[in-house]
Swiss-Prot record:
Species name: Nautilia profundicola (strain ATCC BAA-1463 / DSM 18972 / AmH)
UniProt keywords, alphabetically: Ribonucleoprotein, Ribosomal protein
Pfam family, one: Ribosomal_L13
UniProt key word Ribosomal protein: yes
GO MF, one example: structural constituent of ribosome
Family: Belongs to the universal ribosomal protein uL13 family.
Domain of life of the source: Bacteria
Record protein name field: Large ribosomal subunit protein uL13
Keyword Transit peptide included in the entry's annotation: no
Length: 140
């Protein structure tokens, strides 16, 4: 009988992947980022092991939206006090803090567990073209 060996956390080889978000559709980029963070693009993907790569997103403020989602979609947060449900539109988040917008959207596509929080820490988002990870990102 043959057995499939699943990979261990210490055997995973992690790469740094650079994604330029300039003039690309927001939802398609987020889907690609979530797939890379989970490690589903690798042949040795194992659901219970974090085998994803690091992702660096540049030009996050120049992303496009396919429809009028900028004005319609909202992100909600609650402070814990009565009547303090805060809402922000996607357009406001994109103008003020595009890094937060990318992290919130990606978090919705990752598992809601300790493993998902660990995966989200490997996402680095920058509004401009400059980023401090040029030494890690190779060849992209």
């Amino acid at each position: 009988m043959k057995f499939t060996k699943s990979i261990r956390e210490e055997d995973v080889k992690r790469d740094w992947i650079l994604i330029d978000a300039k003039d690309k559709v927001f939802g398609r980029i987020i889907t690609e980022i979530a797939t890379i963070l989970r490690g589903k693009h690798k042949p040795y993907y194992t659901p219970h092991v974090d085998c994803g790569d690091y992702v660096v997103v540049i030009n996050a403020d120049k992303v496009k939206f396919s429809t009028s989602k900028k004005l319609e979609d909202k992100y909600y947060k609650h402070t814990g006090y009565f009547g303090n449900l805060k809402e922000e539109t996607v357009e406001k988040l994109l103008n003020n803090n595009p890094e937060k917008l990318f992290k919130l959207a990606t978090r919705g596509m990752l598992p809601k567990t300790k493993l998902g929080r660990k995966m989200l820490k490997k996402l680095k988002v920058y509004a401009g073209e400059n980023h401090p990870h040029t030494a890690q990102v190779k060849g992209n």
